[in-house]
Amino acid sequence: MPKKKPTPIQLNPAPDGSAVNGTSSAETNLEALQKKLEELELDEQQRKRLEAFLTQKQKVGELKDDDFEKISELGAGNGGVVFKVSHKPSGLVMARKLIHLEIKPAIRNQIIRELQVLHECNSPYIVGFYGAFYSDGEISICMEHMDGGSLDQVLKKAGRIPEQILGKVSIAVIKGLTYLREKHKIMHRDVKPSNILVNSRGEIKLCDFGVSGQLIDSMANSFVGTRSYMSPERLQGTHYSVQSDIWSMGLSLVEMAVGRYPIPPPDAKELELMFGCQVEGDAAETPPRPRTPGRPLSSYGMDSRPPMAIFELLDYIVNEPPPKLPSAVFSLEFQDFVNKCLIKNPAERADLKQLMVHAFIKRSDAEEVDFAGWLCSTIGLNQPSTPTHAAGV
């Protein structure tokens, strides 16, 4: 794909000269920020939206608990609850994640310090960050509000997400992961549908990435539920890298394409129920497992087999063949893209650069897809959105 010429970024200091959430010398910070942003390959629309967000952010100042008014709950997970809030001094609508942690003040201060790196994460593919602070036993992380919610919520309403839409999602996730790796030397560590946020302007952004090692350690006990997206090498406790994020992306894409978490794989009967036609050659070859006595009969999606215990699931990811897309329903390019993400050996798995030039990504990039229109009609949103009163279009 031809490289876009960087467009100059125009950022104006806040009228009162106030710093960005408690940092000093706003003018110097803005100059450094302007330089970094000009290195990004932004189109005109992305540039204007990022400018609008950063200009508004300058007016926010230091964040305090008393300055927020709760509007509604957006979701819960990863040891925290996320609320849609109004920041009264600026009038901005934000998403505020509250994480309750019983920790010593020194650890708490280290987490807040480590989270400050998020101020430097400015990309069209990363959720905007307003600031973090501690109050009454809880760490607050204040972010841009994305009115379409997360892709796991969208999936519940859509049933399945079309391949063309997932093409645009794949591009955004690859670009977001590439930005984090190249500009900040960090990996995400928790790629899954609930950490991919969307809005009615058609933007797709990553959130909840592992910028604070201390926060990850402090929340280690709450990460059990996310292990189902972890790569085999990570589950085995060996060294892992951004290749692990690529596995998680591949698994997430299969889940969103078929409409349920893909382990264990759907059998022929379930595939027929899912797609309304006989899908040959992709049925699960695993025989039905006997149900462990006393275990509840809940299930993933339409799967009539007994649910897996967490240890069975992790064992399956490590020792059984990886999931794949049913061949009769999806394009060869999409199938191959997912297969390259889900190679069990991380050294053989495709890397970000290889994926960016894959035929599926090239095709998806060239396709005209009204992502915003699809999202709004699927979840019942008005279009276009103004997630904050300052959103530039």
From Swiss-Prot:
The keyword Membrane applies. Residues 1-27 are annotated as: Disordered. It catalyses: L-seryl-[protein] + ATP = O-phospho-L-seryl-[protein] + ADP + H(+); L-threonyl-[protein] + ATP = O-phospho-L-threonyl-[protein] + ADP + H(+); L-tyrosyl-[protein] + ATP = O-phospho-L-tyrosyl-[protein] + ADP + H(+). It is a peripheral membrane protein. InterPro entries: Kinase-like_dom_sf, MAP_kinase_kinase, Prot_kinase_dom, Protein_kinase_ATP_BS, Ser/Thr_kinase_AS. Dual specificity protein kinase which acts as an essential component of the MAP kinase signal transduction pathway. Binding of extracellular ligands such as growth factors, cytokines and hormones to their cell-surface receptors activates RAS and this initiates RAF1 activation. RAF1 then further activates the dual-specificity protein kinases MAP2K1/MEK1 and MAP2K2/MEK2. The record marks 8-9 as: Cleavage. The modification Phosphothreonine is found at residues 286, 292. Belongs to the protein kinase superfamily. STE Ser/Thr protein kinase family. MAP kinase kinase subfamily. ATP binds at residues 74-82, 97. The keyword S-adenosyl-L-methionine does not apply. Its main location: cytoplasm. Disulfide bonds: none annotated. CDD domains: PKc_MEK1. SUPFAM superfamilies: Protein kinase-like (PK-like). It comes from Oryctolagus cuniculus. The gene is MAP2K1. Ras proteins such as HRAS mediate the activation of RAF proteins such as RAF1 or BRAF which in turn activate extracellular signal-regulated kinases (ERK) through MAPK (mitogen-activated protein kinases) and ERK kinases MAP2K1/MEK1 and MAP2K2/MEK2. Activation occurs through phosphorylation of Ser-218 and Ser-222. MAP2K1/MEK1 binds KSR1 or KSR2 releasing the inhibitory intramolecular interaction between KSR1 or KSR2 protein kinase and N-terminal domains. This allows KSR1 or KSR2 dimerization with BRAF leading to BRAF activation and phosphorylation of MAP2K1. The proline-rich region localized between residues 270 and 307 is important for the binding to RAF1 and activation of MAP2K1/MEK1. Its EC number is 2.7.12.2. Residues 270-307 are annotated as: RAF1-binding. This is Dual specificity mitogen-activated protein kinase kinase 1. Residues 68-361 form the Protein kinase domain. Keywords: ATP-binding, Cytoplasm, Cytoskeleton, Kinase, Membrane, Nucleotide-binding, Nucleus, Phosphoprotein, Serine/threonine-protein kinase, Transferase, Tyrosine-protein kinase. It is found in: Cytoplasm, Cytoskeleton, Microtubule organizing center, Centrosome; Cytoplasm, Cytoskeleton, Microtubule organizing center, Spindle pole body; Cytoplasm; Nucleus. The modification Phosphoserine is found at residues 218, 222, 298. The active site is at residue 190.
